[in-house]
Structure formats: C-alpha cells, structure tokens
Amino acid sequence: MSSFDIFSPTTSVSGKFFLEASAGTGKTFTIEQVILRSLLEGNVEQTKNILVVTFTNAATNELKLRIQESLKQALTLFSQALSHPETPLPPYVSSQETKVKQLYXKXRNSLATLDEMNIFTIHGLCRFTLEQHFPWVQPIHPSSMFSEPQTIQQYILDYLRQNSWENVLSPKQYAFLSYHHRATTQQTRHLADRLLQDYASTPNLALPPLSITLQKVKNWSSQYKHLSPLSLEELQDFSLRFKQSDLPIDRELPDFVKQFETDPNSLDILFFPGMVQKFQEENRNKKKLGPPFSPLDPFLKDWLLIAQPFCQKEPIFHTLLKSVQQHLKTYCAQSYSHDESIATLESLLAQNDHVVSQLRKQFQLVLIDEFQDTDKRQWKIFSKLFASPDYSGSLFLIGDPKQSIYEWRNADLPTYLQAKNSFPKESQLILDTNYRSTPQLMQALNHLFSLPSPFLETPQTILYHPLQSKGSASTSYSEFRPIHFFTTQDSQEEALWISKTASYLRSTFAIPFGNMAVLVQDYPQALKLITHSTIPMAYCKEKRIFDRTESPYLLILLLEALLYPENQQKIQAILLSRFFHLSATDIHQHLKIFSSLFFMLNTYLHQYSLLATFYKLMGETVFSQTIGETLLQTPLGDIIFQELEELCLYLDKTTENPHHKLFHLINILDTGKYDEELSFSSQSNDDNVLKITTVHSSKGLEYDVVFCSSLNKVKEKSPSVHMREMYVACTRAKKFLFIPFSSIEKRLQSNKKVSALANYANITQHDNIPHLVETLTASHPEFFSSGTQPPESNISIFSEPLPEQEFFSLPILSSQPIYSFSSTTESQYFTEPFQEISSSSLFPGGSLTGTLIHKLLESLSGNFNASLEEITHKAQTLLKNTILEGFESIISEKIYTAFSTKLPFVSGSFALKDVHPYNIRVEETFLLQENGELWQGIVDLFFEHNNRFFIIDWKTSFLGDEPSLYSPDKLLLYIQRQGLDKQGVLYKRAAKKFLHQFNSSLQIEMAFVFIRGIDDKGNGFLQPSP
C-alpha cells in the first residue's frame, strides 16, 4: 500500500480512499488535516457538507474540539502570513497574497460555522437520517423540554389513552392488568411506569393475536356443544375433586355456565382466573377421585389449554408490551434500540433512492473512523450511500485491523477486508510513520510483529507493515533494551518487580509514576498486583457508575426521601442505608426529627440544585458526626461519595425538575441506556501514582513505560484475538516495554487455554516462552533484553501525606412549619367550628370510621365498576375485627351507590364506574406553598374523564340519617364552617401546578362526596364555586 502524507502537495484529498492507520501514526491528526485541506482547497463548500462518523460520543466531542483548534491555528497562521509574507505555510498552500486572503476568509467562515459540521456515532447518524428524511417514522420531533424517557412516556400514555390496546387484549384482560398495576400500594406500580421500564425488553411471553385465540375458542365450543346445557351442580361437584385454591370460584362457576349457554364463542369464556388456578392437574385431590370418568375432564382440560395463558398477568403484559413497542417504532424514532435504528435505516434506504441521492448531495466529504469496528449492516449503509460510483464526493475509511479488539461490539474483520478489497490498489493507503515511540522501540516492535507471517488469518491474510519512527521521545537504553522480558513466578513477585523497576526508572530517567502503566486482562489481576505493590497504584479502567457500587440505588432512595418527605417508609429506607447507618431503634425514636430534616431538604432541593442538596445533607450532624463522615467510614465510601457527586451533577445538567431527575435515573437503571458522561473513571492525574488499566481501556492512550502483565495471563481466546490484544498492549509504550513470563519451561499445547505471549510463541514456531525470549535476545540484543532481578533504585520508596480535604458551606435555610387540615386546630383557623352529630342508626361515626372507610375506598380504586357482591367481599375482609364489623352490608351499599350514581359536575354528569381504570390515581400527596405557608395534603381521588380532570374528596361526616340533611345548601354551610372551602381551593391549585408542566390550559373540577348521603336526587354531592 502507498504511503499517505497529508502535507504533500501531490497528495489528493479528493476521491475515495481506504486508509490504514497503525497505532501511533497520528490518525486523529490526519482526520483534522483532511477536513482542513478539503475546506481550504474548495472540495467542500461549507462545514455542514462534512460528515464524520466516530465510535463513541466522547470521541465526537474530542474530535470537534481538535478540529476547532486546527482551524484556529490555520486562521492565526494565515493572519501572520498577511502581515509577514515570509511566514512559512504548509507545502500544499500557495504563498500568493491573494490566495492567502481567500484561505483566511475560508478558515474564518469554517470556524464560525463549525457547529454545523455533522459528527456522529453510527447510531447518531441513523437517528439523524430517520428524523430528517423519514418523517413518518417520527412525525413529531422530540421537545427540547423533555428528555428521551419523558418523550417515550408521553407516547406510551397516548397509546393507553387512545385505547390502542383493544387491538391485542380483551377488555377483561386489560382491566385485569390495570387493576394489578394500580399506583395505590407499595406492592404495585402504575402500568405506564412498568411499560416505560420494560419498553426495550423482549416480550417473549406475548400471546398470539386475538383472532387466533378466538378461532381456538370456536373450535373448542363446537367440539363440546353436546354438553349444553351445562349443569352448575355437576360443575360444582366436579370442583370438589380439586384442592382449595387461593382465588375463590364460587362466583365464577355460575358466570361460566351462563357464558357457555349464552355466548360460548366469545373471548369472555376464557377469563375466569379462579377456575384456571383451581383446575390445574397438580391441584387434583387424589382422596376425592369421584367417578372414574367425567365428561367435564376433557372439556375443562381443553379449555385450560386456551384459558391458562389468556388469564396470566405476565403473558398479558408481554402482549401489551409488544404492541406498545410497535406503536413506539411507528410514532417515536427515539424508542429504537441502537441495532434497530441501524436495521431500520438499512431497510428504508434500500427502498428510497431519492433519499440516498439527497444524502449524497448533502455530504461532500465523509470520513468513517475506527472502521475496523464496523459490522456488515453498518457497511451496507455506508457502501450504498458513499462507496457507490454514483457518489461524487470524497470518502475516507480509516481503521486498523490489528486493533480490532471489540468483537463483542459486532466488530467484523471479514467486513473490513471486504470493504478494503472493493477499493482499487492505488486507493488503498497507509500511514507508515509512528510519532509515539522512540526509534529504537519502534524498530523492536517492527521486528516483534514481523515474525508472525502472516500477522493475522481471518481467513484472509493480514500483513504487518513496518513503520518508521519520528517520535519525539528519546531515552538511554543502558540498563534495559526497548523491550525487556522479566521472569516471575506469581503475582506477588511480579508486583514487587514492577514496583522496584518503576522506582528505578523514576529516579534514573525522571519518568513520573503517572507516565507509567500496567496493562492487565481484568480487574482481579489488577487487584492482585495492587495488593502486593510497594508503590502507589490506581486502577483506571473506564467503568459505568452503575457497575461498581450501589451509588445509583442510594441516590434513588435519597431522591424519593427528598421528594416525598411525608412518606415515612421512604424516610426509613434512606435512614437504614449506609448514608445514616442507623438502627431500627434509633429511627423509631427520632423519626420526627429526621422527617423535619427531609422537609427542610425538600425546600432546599427546589431552591438549589441536587448537588448542593447532597452537600447540604453530607454536612448535617447526626449523633456526634456528620452524615458525610458516616458515609466515608463505610467500605468503598470514598468511591460512593465521588460517584454520587458525578450523578448529582449529571442529573442537574439533564433537567431542572427534581421529579424528572428521579425519573431519569430510574430509566437509566431500567433500560441500561446512559450517556458517555456517566462512564466514570477512578483514574488519578497524580504523577505520583502508577496506573493500572485493562488492554481494552488503554486503546488510544500512550505511556512512557508499559508493563504488559496482560500478556502473561492465561485466557481462553482465539489466536487472532490474542495477537490483536498483544499488538494493542505493546504499542501503548513510548520508551520502555516490559513483558513478564514464567521461567518454567512447558511445551505449548495449542488446544488448551494459553496466554497471549504463549500464543505468540506458538505462532512463531517456538517450543515455549523461555525459548522465544532466548531467541529474541540472542538474535537482536539491541532490541530485546531479559533478566530475573529488578534494578535497585537510589532513593527510598516515595511517600507523601495526603492533602487536607477542603470544604465549603452553603447558606443554611431555616425550617418552616408545614400545615395540613388534619393537624391544624379549629380554633386557630376557624371561628365557628361545626359540631358533628355523633349518633347514627346506620353505622358508627368518628375519625376511626372515616379512616377505615377511606382504606376501603382506596382498596377499590380502579375498580369502580365492581359489583355490590365484590364490594361486600372486600369490606368483610378489611373491616373484620374493627368497630365496623357487622356494618359491612350497609357500608358496601353506600359505596356502591357512590360509584354508580351520576355525579352532577358543572361540565356534565357521569358515574365513577364510567371512568377508565387507567385514568385514576388515589391518595396523591402534595406540598404547596400558599401565601408564604407550606401546606401538605392528600388528594383522595384524582382522575381524568372526557379530557377533563377531576378531584373528589371523600367525606364520611355524619350530619344525620335523613337524606335532606345532605342537600347542597346544607353541605355548603358545613364546609364553610369547617373551612373545607379553603381545602378545595388548595387541592385545585396543587393539581393545576402539577398539570401545568404538561399543558397550562387543562381544567380541573373539584367536589366533595359524602358517603352517608349520596343519592340520585343530588344529595351528598357538592361542587364548590370556582
């Protein structure tokens, strides 16, 4: 392959080129200069006509900054040349004054419009193209006000509100699912929340289409129509052959018989969860066999085959999830996973030549970086768009097959070679000058990697091309040669050898520890070396914040406590964590104090940032020491503290809304989608700390001294992978490369696990590693050396006290009392307290009665179309052993009346049973600031119906047994005397404040419903004036 010299006047940057860039050859610099030359020479009209595809988001940001710096330098150079014509310019630039003025104007315009340059990851390019050229994939552009998970949530809510589920679920299935995902108890989560959490999951349990299930039902009913009419008594007797189940079937059996008689071909015949559970074969009671055969046996067995999956919560949910995913793919391009976005774009481009033509015209220069990590599908997109003869612009594919070590990311070397072979030989170029390593080390590396011939076989051959060196680094090789092998028997001996040698290099050559690195295969290997090291070492592998400690989960607990300080269980959860490290006894004794702290922090969070609130919390004193001190004293406490800082800062930059911070963090944990920003490195920039990192994490980095411990670690990998990882590891070094090996001679066995060094010895036809080392040091003593003992340093092991921690304080926000209608005294706020009548002939009065009925109403939320029998059953369960035991029937009748009676709201009358279960929220807590006072309240019932929002406050007050005592005028007098009119105003304001973040025009109506007096004549209902 021909050499590519970006500064040569004879080198063209116009055309299609395949550029191989070995380690240390200035690949990123070359990309910058190709872009600069293309702009200056007029091959590209504007920066918006340039497309660069890189591997990571971090790389896109770094590249844009480097391009910006190159343009600034060019601008400065041309400015100097205009003032001082003798200023030397790049060889490809004319020194004519007119030409220099033109170049100055081009560089200035390019710098001003740099933000228009298109620098993407492959997935970013796919999303950009889908949004720009396929609007039907994403008809609504995502609002900048919402993050990606918030946008997806809105699409899920639209799907549910539009009843799109009707295409895949029966009404009973959906009601069943909604009931089990009510946001009313700690054990359940809202259906929309779970759909958002799992929207990227694979719905493996999804049921077949309803049409197929319906056909199975019809076949079943036709097969057993001779059993009609079905005997309820026989079915009840047959059920005795089975053990008692958790779900009662007493009410299901009559309904099943009726359904079989009236409409056996309906899907409703399947939805009897109690029968499905009861008639499982494993529940058969062997002691009650009954007659040897019953026609109901095959009848119910065949029914179970259809009904069992139809009634199970997870298959129903997966069916809904699959439909939601299709909805998101149709209407929200953001919901595509990375692989799906690539597949979608590939498919759409294959059918849209017009879009292909537009993209070719838009991009006059295309550079694909890290091409060795490209897979077949990505290459098909690039090939169709830019490698085609119909593309008239310039294309650079830039990569190095020797550094393709990311096979788990679908990196595909055969695709790389196929793409390379599609270019003519004269367009296959190479960067053949190394700017990283010393000339001596470069020569040693050339020899080391020229021995395997070919370098790789995959099955095509890949050759190693020796590089010349123009590295600025220089050193003396008296004690060691550029590549030095040292013997070691275990991790302890290896760590001591590295410690002594690193100390010697620092004292002799003034190389800081911070410019040295130990490369390992994995964290366990790093941990062993750190444990036995006698000098400071730090593990520097890039990791997600979510991979190492529980800090994200701690932050979720903290955010929940900060956002909902009225919820004692959320407060207790954070108090039990390592933040506070308190016992249950301590929490119980001081819960009020801690609740007051979190109410104060809640206000602090809304006035300041999450990071500021975190620091405020860390400075609070609990039992003689600060919370921060308590955290730092726990295992990994210092790491957790750092990670929490990073997370708080990230969430503060993501959104200002505290609730959205919690939502965003939960979504990251659920979906695994995170920004590059959350790749957290424990790396220290301290020059007095030697770095330890993995080979994969070291790619793209360089160090003066490299200890390749990874080459001595036995791993089960293919010879090709071993070879590529060895190349990446060795080419990180600028001056010295040290490779450990075991001196025990063992004949290599290629069919077993081996180290990368043993694999190399095998490929180069050596008996074992000692034989390899002996051959290299004997044949080329100027490049290779070996030894057993480390050199002695002239100075003692470095030791320096840690710097004293600096702290800063934030202003202390004074606490403020929080009022509620249940905690304020009547005499303080209301001059004429209303005396409630205490004697009732229906059921007892008092606050305990109100609490119990509210609990009953809460348990029935989302099920307002429940029958009287269902309500009574629930009441009997909840009111057992309470003061209301024995009054279940009358209370159930009152509640049933409240659910089924049309409520005369101003906007129109309707019954609660007509409200869709999904649109109902109960026991919603709020905190509202009103005239400088903080008011806390709980909304009994908040729901949406016919595109309007409503609040209902249940009242169990006893005003008498006569219905007329609950007329609107009597109720108005009651709520005015009790101050409940102010309660209604505050509840509406709190709801409006919540809804305002979505739509400021939404209207809310609020009403009081008196359980004792509600009827169809208008009694028991009061809607206060606006």
From Swiss-Prot:
Alphabetical GO biological process terms: double-strand break repair via homologous recombination
Gene Ontology CC terms, in alphabetical order: cytosol; exodeoxyribonuclease V complex
Cofactor-binding details, from the entry: Binds 1 Mg(2+) ion per subunit.
Name of the protein in its database record: RecBCD enzyme subunit RecB
UniProt domain comment: The N-terminal DNA-binding domain is a ssDNA-dependent ATPase and has ATP-dependent 3'-5' helicase function. This domain interacts with RecC.
Region ranges (Nuclease activity, interacts with RecD and RecA): 815-1026
Domain of life, source organism: Bacteria
Region DNA-binding and helicase activity, interacts with RecC, annotated ranges: 1-766
Role noted for this protein: A helicase/nuclease that prepares dsDNA breaks (DSB) for recombinational DNA repair. Binds to DSBs and unwinds DNA via a highly rapid and processive ATP-dependent bidirectional helicase activity. Unwinds dsDNA until it encounters a Chi (crossover hotspot instigator) sequence from the 3' direction. Cuts ssDNA a few nucleotides 3' to the Chi site. The properties and activities of the enzyme are changed at Chi. The Chi-altered holoenzyme produces a long 3'-ssDNA overhang and facilitates RecA-binding to the ssDNA for homologous DNA recombination and repair.
